[in-house]
């Protein structure tokens, strides 16, 4: 193989987790998609983030990153889902450092640029429960947020203003989880 091709392949492998669109104002992470079970958006979001980090480190599949298992372990009847504090604890018990914070647009951009997907809580309506999604990308030129929405599909394009409204209604709750070994 010619040296130029080898350099190109090595470069592509080095950035495979963070993909930049042709437009420098947009970026997205190739976060695996997991479809949720009933009331299972939290479990599916945890599974997506854990599977993403497994891919980044070339680790084999881990049963602790399966949404059905996470749902069985963490489901709370009173919450009709999973409590945010239990999501954080699950990550910590499985070798992750976690940070929960009231996020801003700049936080999403900074973490995505570093190859770190985020879990965000959204409140789609006044009577609907919280809904957890994985923020996997941004398209600033088109003012879109790219979500892995476990109730819908991978890379769902949501208008930034709608995302901000639903995120604000949920207190802008944001969870960052990174493997302890990576310290990314």
What are these regions (language model features)?
Residues 22, 79, 113, 117, ...:
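Noncatalytic regulatory segments and standalone regulatory/sensor domains
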Residues 40, 44-48, 69, 82, ...:
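Extracytoplasmic/secreted proteins, especially bacterial periplasmic and envelope-associated proteins
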Residues 2-8, 15-80, 124, 141, ...:
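Active-site-adjacent structural segments surrounding the nucleophilic cysteine of cysteine proteases
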């Amino acid at each position: 193989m010619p040296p130029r091709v080898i350099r190109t392949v090595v470069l592509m492998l080095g950035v495979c987790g963070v993909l930049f669109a042709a437009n420098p104002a947009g970026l997205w992470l190739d976060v695996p998609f997991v479809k949720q079970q009933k009331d299972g958006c939290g479990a599916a979001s945890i599974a997506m983030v854990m599977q993403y980090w497994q891919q980044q480190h070339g680790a084999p599949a881990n049963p602790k990153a399966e949404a059905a298992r996470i749902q069985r372990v963490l489901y709370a009847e009173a919450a009709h889902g999973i409590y945010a504090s239990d999501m954080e604890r699950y990550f910590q018990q499985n070798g992750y450092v976690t940070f929960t914070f009231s996020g801003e647009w700049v936080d999403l951009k900074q973490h995505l640029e570093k190859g770190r997907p985020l879990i965000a809580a959204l409140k789609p309506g006044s009577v609907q429960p919280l809904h957890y999604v994985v923020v996997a990308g941004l398209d600033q030129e088109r003012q879109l947020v790219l979500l892995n929405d476990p109730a819908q599909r991978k890379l769902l394009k949501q208008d930034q203003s709608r995302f901000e409204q639903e995120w604000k209604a949920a207190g802008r709750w944001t969870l960052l989880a990174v493997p302890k070994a990576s310290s990314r």
